[in-house]
A protein has these predicted regions:
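Sensory modules in modular signal-transduction proteins
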Residues: 1-25, 30
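PAS-family sensory domains
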Residues: 76-82, 95
Length: 110
């Protein structure tokens, strides 16, 4: 997968991201960027508005990296302007610009 292949994802109303093996965001779609209300690129969850939830989020990322298996979970995170929310999440192993990564797609459960 390459950055140019993901342009259609920017039009989708769900959150989509790609993280490198260190947990840094290397691609996010417009919905996630708008929700975060701060620059995400190159940062980890520990540096974001949902930093209190970073340990659990990173644990799920590591499971995918270690096993190579797709993970379907509910994650809990603090979303700026909304407070604590439950997210329905699918994380999967992939490749981005030639490097191993974890991609994810999620939406808030109302």
């Amino acid at each position: 997968m390459q950055r140019k292949d993901l342009e259609v994802i920017n039009e989708m109303p769900f959150y989509f991201w790609v993280k490198d093996e260190e947990g840094k965001y290397i691609f996010v779609n417009r919905a996630l960027a708008d929700m975060a209300q701060q620059d995400i690129m190159g940062k980890t969850d520990r540096e974001m508005g949902w930093s209190a939830d970073a340990e659990g989020l990173r644990g799920d990322d590591k499971k995918v990296l270690e096993t190579g298996k797709t993970l379907y979970v509910h994650e809990y995170a603090h979303v700026p302007g909304r407070g604590k929310v439950t997210l329905n999440v699918c994380k999967f192993l992939g490749e981005f610009d030639g490097k191993k990564c974890v991609s994810g797609i999620s939406f808030v459960i109302e």
